[in-house]
């Protein structure tokens, strides 16, 4: 595996994570909201135990989690230098990521490959983590329409999203797991990202997803506790940096030939 390199403006802090919302329900890999308990570590461990299949098999599974909280309506510098809404930048990035996974799966027909793409935010009456593309073999069919419907609103439950996405990865039974989160804000609701990352680190080696958090237009140093819990935190301040960071992660750490 080759070691990824990043632009100097990015902040690399080590380990696992990428940001979004939600806890899970009682079913394996379900996408929903986990009831918060006085002891977060115990509750998160129990949620992860409930979603782990009995048998593991070789293969690649990835969950891409995209922040759609209200601040994603704000603007950053786009690829063309104009001020562009963050959600529009995220939509384009999501389409590109799906294409990369489709291409990888086509080149490796004998390797099990599964991809799920999710949005997250805290909204009344909705789960924190919501599927854009259900976990399964990479497929571009219908993805464009689903991505086009992404709309910013609500809070930023990054830890809850991480937990629910990890449950979805657990349900695949595949041993090479990656959780990629893109968020432009700090955690506002539910479990903290560092509590979830710490729980992931307690899992058996074959059940631990690598977690990558890309902080979009927010300082990576705000996620120092996540770094201390074993996360890899990367910073991107505009559309070009975001695309470069995601491409380097995908080709250097996730879809490794």
What residue ranges belong to the model's regions?
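Short beta-strand-loop
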Residues: 74-75, 104-146, 168-172, 190-194, ...
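Second-shell loop/turn segments in exported
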Residues: 51-52, 75-88, 105, 130-134, ...
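Bacterial N-terminal signal peptides that target proteins for export
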Residues: 1-11
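Bacterial N-terminal signal peptides
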Residues: 9-20
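Acidic, polar low-complexity linker/tail segments
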Residues: 22-80, 167, 255
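VWA/integrin I-like adhesion module and closely mimicked acidic/polar interface patches used
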Residues: 149-155, 185-249
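Von Willebrand factor
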Residues: 32-35, 47, 55-182, 218, ...
């Amino acid at each position: 595996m080759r070691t990824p390199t990043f632009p100097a403006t990015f902040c690399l802090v080590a380990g696992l994570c990428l940001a979004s919302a939600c806890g899970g329900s009682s079913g394996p890999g379900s996408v929903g909201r986990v009831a918060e308990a006085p002891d977060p570590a115990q509750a998160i461990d129990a949620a992860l135990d409930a979603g782990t299949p009995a048998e593991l098999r070789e293969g690649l599974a990835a969950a891409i989690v995209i922040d759609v909280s209200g601040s994603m309506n704000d603007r950053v510098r786009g690829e063309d230098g104009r001020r562009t809404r963050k959600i529009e930048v995220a939509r384009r990035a999501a389409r590109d990521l799906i294409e990369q996974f489709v291409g990888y799966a086509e080149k490796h027909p004998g390797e099990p490959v599964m991809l799920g793409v999710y949005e997250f935010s805290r909204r009344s009456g909705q789960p924190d983590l919501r599927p854009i593309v259900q976990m399964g073999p990479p497929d571009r069919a219908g993805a464009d329409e689903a991505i086009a419907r992404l709309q910013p609103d609500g809070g930023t439950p990054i830890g809850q999203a991480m937990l629910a996405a990890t449950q979805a990865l657990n349900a695949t039974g595949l041993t090479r797991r990656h959780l990629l989160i893109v968020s432009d804000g700090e955690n506002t609701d539910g479990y903290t990202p560092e509590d979830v990352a710490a729980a992931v680190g307690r899992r058996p080696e074959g059940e631990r997803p690598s977690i990558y958090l890309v902080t979009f237009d927010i300082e990576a140093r705000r996620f120092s506790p996540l770094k201390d819990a074993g996360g890899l935190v990367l910073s991107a301040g505009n559309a070009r940096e975001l695309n470069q960071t995601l491409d380097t992660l995908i080709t250097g750490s996730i879809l490794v030939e």
